[in-house]
Amino acid sequence: MALGRVGLAVGLWGLLWVGVVVVLANASPGRTITVGPRGNASNAAPSASPRNASAPRTTPTPPQPRKATKSKASTAKPAPPPKTGPPKTSSEPVRCNRHDPLARYGSRVQIRCRFPNSTRTEFRLQIWRYATATDAEIGTAPSLEEVMVNVSAPPGGQLVYDSAPNRTDPHVIWAEGAGPGASPRLYSVVGPLGRQRLIIEELTLETQGMYYWVWGRTDRPSAYGTWVRVRVFRPPSLTIHPHAVLEGQPFKATCTAATYYPGNRAEFVWFEDGRRVFDPAQIHTQTQENPDGFSTVSTVTSAAVGGQGPPRTFTCQLTWHRDSVSFSRRNASGTASVLPRPTITMEFTGDHAVCTAGCVPEGVTFAWFLGDDSSPAEKVAVASQTSCGRPGTATIRSTLPVSYEQTEYICRLAGYPDGIPVLEHHGSHQPPPRDPTERQVIRAVEGAGIGVAVLVAVVLAGTAVVYLTHASSVRYRRLR
């Protein structure tokens, strides 16, 4: 009986230690408690010896991976990392809404810039204008949107604005329409301090260019700088002028694309009665630069001549490239007119020269020239006679008294449209001999005139002598 109780007690005691080992193994996955010889816990057999059970040893082992379980802790998603946005505007020295604006000629342009670090007592802003991006004073074309540090305004610019005008160097050159007392004012800067708005009242070829914004503290006004480029564009105005031609002259028409900018490319395509003109010898195009932009003139000459068929209708198509990606296209049309070739005759009747021109348009008149004199002779009346049978034309006649000094006479028609060649008639006539009595009268008049002139000179000289003598005597009496 006693031995049975002892055995039962030893068995219960062993079971208790096995339970403790299992609990400790589950509670600490990083440590394994072994009983008896070294080895894995799964291979160690529990010993019933009280001596072995009373002296357990612990051996540290590397952590073992745990099997995945369906617990909530294992299925929870990790927290997302905090989002990092752009830096705050307060850390940026400037922020402009437009660094390369392109606007129409004559429009009003606004450029807004923010200066987060500015204060009312320390902030100073200057804006300078340069004609072009590659100005010799600037050097290479500056980078837009780049903020430069400790860079003063390059030489050669014109000052547009200074927030501290009392500190402006008196030797600076103000841009036209800027500075104290400018009228009319072309530039203005408005808005609260730190949020400045540059306003260009009228964008032209003179007000476009590179604008350099330089700012900083009052004692360090060139701390930062940035460039803004302002560009202007001006679409061309298109006009067509079909030339009036005389019978036998080739038809012509001229198209003009005027005052456009920039002058990249202005291309003309010509059509005559709906058919394109391909022969480059028939088209002459020339471009010139003016103070207000560029102008291109293109003239087409037809192979057909007036009077041998109906008048021709010309169409010019203009393609203007504003930049490398934008272009506009316009058309203009007109019909040429044909004028009859006039007949001009000259005759001398008595003491007059008579010039007659038939089939001239309304508004045409005469101009007379004598000898080598390039200036017209005295104005003479022009009489219009009957029509020559064509609508809008008439026969006109003019008379001119003959000259006693000249023998060559030119009768020229004036008032024809541009492009019509000079129409004139030349004639010769010997001046008639003068009447002897008339010559004597002329000589008598000339002699009388000379005598009167001499008499007037003598009277004036005598009066001067008398006046000087009287003045001298009066002065002598006063001295005595």
UniProtKB/Swiss-Prot annotation:
SUPFAM superfamilies, alphabetized: Immunoglobulin
GO biological process, any: symbiont entry into host cell
Positions in the Virion surface compartment: 28-447
Record's bilayer topology term: Single-pass membrane protein
Disulfide partners: 96-113, 255-316, 355-411, 359-388
Residue intervals on the Cytoplasmic side: 469-480
Alphabetized Gene3D superfamilies for the sequence: Immunoglobulins
Domain named Ig-like: residues: 236-328
Subcellular location: Virion membrane
UniProt GO cellular component terms: membrane; virion membrane
One Pfam family it belongs to: Marek_A
Transmembrane segments: 448-468
Record keywords: Disulfide bond, Glycoprotein, Host-virus interaction, Immunoglobulin domain, Inhibition of host complement factors by virus, Membrane, Signal, Transmembrane, Transmembrane helix, Viral attachment to host adhesion receptor, Viral attachment to host cell, Viral immunoevasion, Virion, Virus entry into host cell
Summary of subunit composition and partner proteins: Interacts with host complement component C3b; this interaction inhibits host immune response by disregulating complement cascade.
Job of this protein: Major attachment protein that mediates binding of the virus to cell surface heparan sulfate or chondroitin sulfate. Also plays a role in host immune evasion by inhibiting the host complement cascade activation.
Note: There are seven external glycoproteins in HSV-1 and 2: gH, gB, gC, gG, gD, gI, and gE.
Family, as annotated: Belongs to the herpesviridae glycoprotein C family.
This protein's name: Envelope glycoprotein C
Organism listed in the record: Human herpesvirus 2 (strain HG52) (HHV-2)
